[in-house]
Each structure stands twice: as C-alpha cells, then as structure tokens.
Amino acid sequence: MDFKAADNLQDLQYFGEYGGVNPSISDSSTYTFLSAKTMFDTFEGNTEGCYLYSRHSSPSNLYLGEALAALEGTETANVTASGMGAISAVILQLCNAGDHIVSSRTIYGGTYALMKNFLKKFNIGISFVDTTNLDAVAMAITPKTKMLYCESVSNPLLEVADIEALSKLAKKNNIPLVVDNTFSPLSISPAKLGADIVIHSLTKFINGTSDCVAGVVCGTKDFCLGLKDVNNGAGMLLGSTLDSLRASSILKNMRTLHIRMKKHSENAMYLAKNFEKDGLRVVYPGLKSHVGHKVMKKQYNMEYGFGGLMTLDVGSLEKANALMELMQKKHLGYLAVSLGFYKTLFSAPGTSTSSEIPLEEQLEMGLSNGLIRFSIGLDDHIDRTYMAMKDCLIKLDILKPLSIKV
C-alpha cells in the first residue's frame, strides 16, 4: 500500500504558546469571549478557532484528533475518554430504536456486552456472524441494518477481516462499515481499504505506556461534526470527554508509534515462528498456517509487520494460569489485560477480556480454556526472551525437552 501514515505524522508540526516544541496544554474547562455576540455565534457553530467549553472541544483534543486522522487517512477524528466511549457514540449516532447491526462474533468482550446486553434497552437488534464468511454476512443484512461492524484483527482469536470485501458488501447495501483497528495501527489502514469509520482504543498501542484510557472515532467531517452536535450528537451528549493533559501525552507518544510497531511485530513473529516449530498451537497472522494469512498479506503495510499480538493454546486453564504466573515470576512480562505496553502482557481471555461472552459461545467460536493472549513487548534480545519462555513451558510439562544424544 502506498499510504505513508508515519510520514503524515512526522509532517505534523505544532508550536507551543511560547515557542515550545510541544503544543501548549489547554488546562481550562471553559473559555472567555470579548463579546457576548461571539459567544452566541460559537454556540451556533458559526465561529472558527473559538472554544466554548471543553466537553465540546479543546485545543489539545483537536491537535490529537488531527494526528489520528493523519494516521488513518480520514478527513478528521474525534477523541473520546475511552475506546468504549468511541464505540458507543458511533452506534448511537448511526442507529435508532428498531434498527439492526451486523457484527463480527469475535470482538472485544466489552463491545460484545454493549451490543448483546445493553442495546436491548434501545430496541436495537444485533446479528453476530463470522465476518470471514462473506455469504454469512450478506445473509444477515436486513432492510433495518444500519451498520456493519468488525475488528481488523479480532480480539482475542486474531481473525483477519477482509476489509475491502466487507466494504464492497456494505456499500452495495448502503450501510457504513465500522472497523475497530486497535490491534493493528499502521499495520492496517482500514479507511484506505474502504472502511467508512475507524475506531481505536488509544489506551493500547497508540499510547503505548498503559498509563491512560482513551479512544477515537476517525471519519468524515460531516460524521464527526454530527457526533459533536449540541442537540443531537451522541459524542457530545454522552459526555465521553478526554482530558486535555492525557490528549497531550498521547500525542507525544504517537511520535514513536512507527518505531514501536515495527519492534512489536518483529518480536511477535520471532516467537510465533519458533513456538510453532516447537510444536505448540500458535495463532499469529504472520504465520503461513494462519487461516487469514493471505488476507493479511493482501492488505497490510509491510514495513510494520503482522502486529504484536499472538496466542498460544496450552490445553487447559490450569496450565495457562500456571504458565502466566511462572512467566511473571521470571520477569518475562505481566499477568494483565490490555495490550501495546513496552513489556509483554499476557492473559487468558476466556476468563478476562472475553468473560462477558457466554461459555458455550466462546467454545463455538474457538475460544478454548487453554488459550493465552500475548501482547509482545519491545524486548531488545527476543532470542533471550524465547529461551526463558521455553524454559517455563518445559518446567510445566507443556513442552517436552528435546532428547539429548550422548
């Protein structure tokens, strides 16, 4: 793909109020006006460059939104206080009572719970389907469908969505394709493949330091302005406002995203290849054995690799828990949810990030008890990490040591 997101970010240049190399932080909740008429015009949306109240917008949030739009290649972007804040705002902006959504069945547990449990209160229907099966997606679409939703790389099974094909199907039915690209910033550019709206949890790779919670909606100017409408905008009225200080820190961390994503992907590929050679059940989109490998190769940005997430299936929850506890004890990472941190994070999604999904549905979609999701860190010597992880696997009898010939 010719789209150069990292160059777009590098070309952004802001000056602080006193000439600083970082833009000044707008540390105010409300803003003054020299005339009452200007305040009125700002309420009406008829003034450029004026700020009224930080739930509406703030300079720090607009700077970050501009950078995220450059990252995804969209016209603009609205930042939110969490990824779920972004997802819920988009859904309630697009859907009214009686409408319908077609969603991937393998999605983040919080999104699943929102769609299956909470949206009932608004009489919004949901069909969960295997979005890698285009026929199943087409059959699920009804005249009431107002949105097709998927994750570029799914949480936690790492299924790869054929975004271009899904986009064609969505356009054929005059519905927007909404893609959560949290797992694959830079690696995949959904808007360039036909997605209408791109969502991220900024908490993960984009921020990269696991010290804040934030989200974003990337899309057209019309859609994002609609989200901020003071009378009808779901983003405005639900009030998921990102703090200016956090917006500023995320913007600074974005400057190293291209370097970090390359290293996350490089390390994940090394571990996935070697553990697969060892005979373990590994899922990683960069492996030829991955069912979505060809789709991933067709749409990924090669220089950023196949992403920093991989899974290992060690056979049982007991073994998974024992392995994670031992790896943490050996300083190989943290037994923690989330992803995109500079140190490796691991969790058993069936009992954590996907626990909102009923057990029978977990099994139906292939989410086994022994599955461990790894967010691979920025280890400088990944071969050293591999050997230490392998020692843990051998110690717990998950992996057999090679026979030693005398």
Predicted regions mapped to residue ranges:
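Conserved small-domain helix->loop->beta segment predominantly found in fold-type I
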Residues: M269-K343, I357-L363, S403-V406
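Conserved PLP-enzyme active-site core in the AAT-like
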Residues: A5-Y14, T76-V283, K297, I404-K405
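Glycine-rich beta-alpha junction loops
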Residues: Y14, D27-L34, F183, L271, ...
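N-terminal "arm"/small-domain region of PLP-dependent enzymes with the aminotransferase-like
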Residues: M1-S58, E66, I372-S375
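PLP-dependent enzyme catalytic core of the Aspartate aminotransferase-like
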Residues: K116, G125-S127, P143, L317-E318, ...
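Short Gly/aromatic-enriched secondary-structure transition segments
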Residues: F40-T47, E325-M327, M389-D391
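Conserved N-terminal alpha-helix of the aminotransferase class I/II PLP-enzyme fold
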Residues: S35-G85, G110-N117
